[in-house]
């Protein structure tokens, strides 16, 4: 097992688990919630995070970050079960790819379009993307008057 999996993967697992717990308290109808203004629906926010995860997962395979992927599956952002299944697949694929890296592979660089960073740093930035998503989602949950799980209060605020 590589150093990242031993020392840091728990952060990714933890952020994925927080997202899973959020989806567990939502209904399909909740995904249509929009707090107003130029914001997207909660379901669209979840779909967007999945597209971001897809970009990061693919970058671990191609060593290039490509942000253009859009999941066009009809009804994805209106179905909690579809989102759960998609995230489960994305999470598993990313973990399998990361587990296959050697410690030396963690130093390989990933082109992010104008600059590059090591695989290990790319994974750290992915954790930050997850935390940003969870912060956004917490605003939606608060606007919906949903209680935040205890770990959200500790990690996100």
Residue ranges and their predicted role:
Residues 75-111, 117-139:
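Acidic/histidine-rich alpha-helical segments that form the ligand environment
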Residues 5, 9-13, 17-23, 28-71, ...:
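Short, contiguous alpha-helical
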Residues 2-9, 79-81:
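Active-site rim elements
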Residues 2, 71, 77-78, 102, ...:
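Serine/threonine-rich low-complexity intrinsically disordered regions
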